[in-house]
């Protein structure tokens, strides 16, 4: 289980050495409790939304268990994985047969985390590049960010950096890249904008790169 230490507290103060971890709970994973169930594209296309819906509901159900486990072990920071909705940018979430159950389960997960004072964040995948010169990459990046933000909306999490969606810019600095990044950023929903933070990788003039 990867461990990190964060100091940001919900009330704006500091809480040094708050223990958290990223994505996979290796203890619960041995019990097949995970939010990372997925499928390859061929399976997605062959089995359709009914199968996807079952997978998503199982992921959401286990998220509740993970949040409770975190509280039982005094862990207050959890970076969720990105796979709760496999192939989630390829369909309307409302079209999932179990959507109502999924939404309700995610709401319970969010309420539980909030009641415990846990900070939930996410780190969308490295292919999210708002400053790309390729329109398809920008379009897919926006879709992926909005999917992450929608999950947080369903959980009732704040639309602030406290519940951050952390990304890299993914390329070296230039005025053109910056302009494209801002143009793409302006297409995001207000909740997604409110959660978005850019990681400073301390390279190429302190501009975020991969």
List where the protein language model places each region.
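Alpha/beta catalytic barrel-like cores
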Residues: 6-118, 128-131, 136-141, 149-150, ...
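Short, electropositive alpha-helical surface patch
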Residues: 132-145, 175-186
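Active-site groove signature of glycoside hydrolases
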Residues: 157-172
